[in-house]
Amino acid sequence: MTIFERSKKGRKAFRLPESDIPEYSLPDRFLRSTPPKLPEVSEPDVVRHYTDLARKNYSVDLGIYPLGSCTMKYNPKLNEKAANLEGFREIHPYQPVETVQGSLRLMYELKEMLCEITGMDDMTLQPAAGAHGELTGMLIVREYFKNRGDTGRKKVLVPDSAHGTNPASASMVGFEVVEIKSKNGMVDVEDLRKLLDEEVAAVMLTNPNTLGLFEKDILKIAEMTHECGALLYYDGANLNAIMGKVRPGDMGFDIVHLNLHKTFSTPHGMGGPGSGPVGVKKHLVDFLPFPQVKKNGELYELFVPEKTIGRVRSFFGNFPVLVKAYTYILTMGRDGLERVSEMAVLNANYLKKKIEKFLEIPYNGFCMHEFVASAEKVFRETGVRTLDIAKRILDFGVHPPTVYFPLIVPEALMIEPTETENKETLDKYAEILERVVKEAYENPDALKNAPHNTPVRRVNEVLASKKPVFRWRG
């Protein structure tokens, strides 16, 4: 039931006091011809409606949320308190810089810390999401070569295991995307060698990659990329696996985008809010978006980089998300962030060891923060697909993994438990997944018709994609 369907004429949740300001009639041209169709509800109606919706929802505050490549870690509530401090909450982006020195200091120190973590020389905090960061990075790549007069570089190389946003971001900027083949789950260096030429502008990589494997040839890849005059771009989706262990800048990457809403523990899902800062090495600093924050003595100021690509977001990005990430980094400290990565890798390997007893692991061995299992054998023997397994998992009150990604693994389940889950939770999740796989052999229809216990049963996803309904019509 929607809030509109709860509406009863004449009900009110709030009454305004009588105004002591003289009435003023707006000109007719500014008036609506009909009253707005707003719900008329009491305060209990509103509270109960949204409480009911919250009970039907699932979040990391309720349990494990092991979406691969999403890093759905628990978000400490201290971060929320910091973002809600009056000095941050009540400011306006048009205020004079002298009156928002605390906010500018936070942004300056945050980018300094992120540069230290990633091995970059400078960073913009403007992009509002990971894909937005990718787009910003690709705009920097394009502007860099345009500035050099090297306009023949029209290609971007992307592994076949890459996030779908990688080729999409490169294409949006006007680059031709060329796929690099994988070998044993990692970049095929020989295939890359064949593709590298004077037309290549950049190579986009995630390390660890989407299979949860560390690209062991990364230094060689960086050397080959730079020898042909191209730039090496780092998709920071999986940074949670390597903090304090190795830095993208030290691997040879020229550009990096981060996901503060993943690695640095700010709530995400359902479209945001996110933050996708972009860091660059020294030779690309002048191309960063504006405004940038700098420190001039004791004063923090805004400035425009010399060859800037322009604005990519209004004002300063998603500022409350920046506050939460800043709080998280200060709370954890260097040793704490390193421990985060250690525990993320440990949890993934522990869960993989449990799951490999009943599901295939195409690229087995030591993984990093996540791993990919395959239900291809289950599908072949029972007709039950990965989608059916994921839907049935919902009936047990936990969230399923990412499914059908990366595309190079048939019937894929991509699992990232993160560092914030304990052993008991991991054991329980493995137990649920094993039970569902066993049920696929004993009662496949139970999976094909799942979920059975959720407020919304299985939806027609094809119809929803082709004919989406985005708003309620009374």
From Swiss-Prot:
Enzyme class: oxidoreductase
Molecular function, one GO term: pyridoxal phosphate binding
Modified residues (N6-(pyridoxal phosphate)lysine): 262
Keyword Oxidoreductase: yes
Gene Ontology CC: cytosol; glycine cleavage complex
GO biological process: glycine decarboxylation via glycine cleavage system
CDD domains, alphabetized: GDC-P (cd00613)
Keyword set includes Oxidoreductase: yes
Cofactor: pyridoxal 5'-phosphate
InterPro entries, sorted: GcvPB, GDC-P_C, GDC-P_N, GDC_P, PyrdxlP-dep_Trfase, PyrdxlP-dep_Trfase_major, PyrdxlP-dep_Trfase_small
Described function: The glycine cleavage system catalyzes the degradation of glycine. The P protein binds the alpha-amino group of glycine through its pyridoxal phosphate cofactor; CO(2) is released and the remaining methylamine moiety is then transferred to the lipoamide cofactor of the H protein.
Classification via PANTHER family: GLYCINE DEHYDROGENASE (DECARBOXYLATING), MITOCHONDRIAL (PTHR11773:SF1), GLYCINE DEHYDROGENASE, DECARBOXYLATING (PTHR11773)
Family note: Belongs to the GcvP family. C-terminal subunit subfamily.
Protein name: Probable glycine dehydrogenase (decarboxylating) subunit 2
Lineage: Bacteria, Thermotogati, Thermotogota, Thermotogae, Thermotogales
